[in-house]
Amino acid sequence: TRGRERSRDPYSIQKEARNLYNNGYKEITLLGQNVDSYKWSKEANNKKKLEKSNDIKDIISFSDLLEMIAKINPDLRVRFSTSHPKDITNDVLMVIKKYENVCNYIHLPAQSGNSRILKKMNRTYDRDWYLNKIHDIKKIVGKDCGISSDFITGFCSETEDEHKDTLSLMDNVIYDYSYMYYYSERPGTLAQRKYNDDVTLETKKRRLSEIIKKQNKHSLSKNKLTVDNTYKVLVEGVSKKSNNFLKGKTSENKLIVFPQKKALIGTYVDVKVKECNSATLFGEIC
């Protein structure tokens, strides 16, 4: 379902980002199927060749690209997605730590908390590897770094104990939020060709309900930690529920809603969190 990985010329990305900033944009997202596998050189645009060759010099990695964009202007917020647990490097984490305008947030899909299921999914890492990456994030970037994930429950042959491994992984990490689904066959995929979709729909739905319930609990507990704290927020627009309120996001990618008070869309404001639910922070401009 995917072609060979290609990395776009970093200088063209830098130029585009600078032009966007000069035209009034305050936030950009570096987007890729797996941004951490980014590797580019004038001599070759082939990740495998660049990784194997000792002769090719001046290779630009994703951490290099991220820093190039961060340096354009401190008022330009930079996000990126999606990271792969096997490829994200400490160099990337160091760039996040170094530059305030690189958002304090990482989407790191786990998919499952069980190593056997991860192997069947062809994820190329196991549970311990993933947890070590989470440890690196919290150690280098900080414990306040926003972390989200993806989970697929009811994958082929997943047992009840293996499902519980996913629940225990969630308890270990405590994600800010997650995207959660139950497994359904996609024609032409490796899983569809190799494995029987043998977990009943009833079981899939029940397991999905369990991980959603746990994530909602974790999201609320993480959001409660923000109450009485003040965050720099980029005003993104008017709240869907009231024209008297604006909405924006913190560096940690948390949605926050607050009264207008003459704040302009596209500007930064300091907002103090007053209350929250599992999905949204509610605050006031300082």
Predicted features along the sequence, with ranges:
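Active-site proximal loops enriched in glycine and acidic residues that flank catalytic Cys/His/Asp
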Residues: 32, 82-84, 110-112, 149-153, ...
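C-terminal, non-catalytic macromolecule-binding modules
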Residues: 165-211
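Canonical Radical SAM [4Fe-4S] cluster-binding loop centered on the CxxxCxxC motif
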Residues: 1-11
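Terminal RNA-binding accessory module
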Residues: 191-286
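Small-residue (G/A/S/T)-rich helix-start motifs and N-terminal tracts that mark the onset
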Residues: 9-27
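Conserved SAM/AdoMet-binding glycine-rich loop
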Residues: 22-161, 171
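Conserved, mostly hydrophobic/aromatic
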Residues: 13, 30, 80, 108, ...
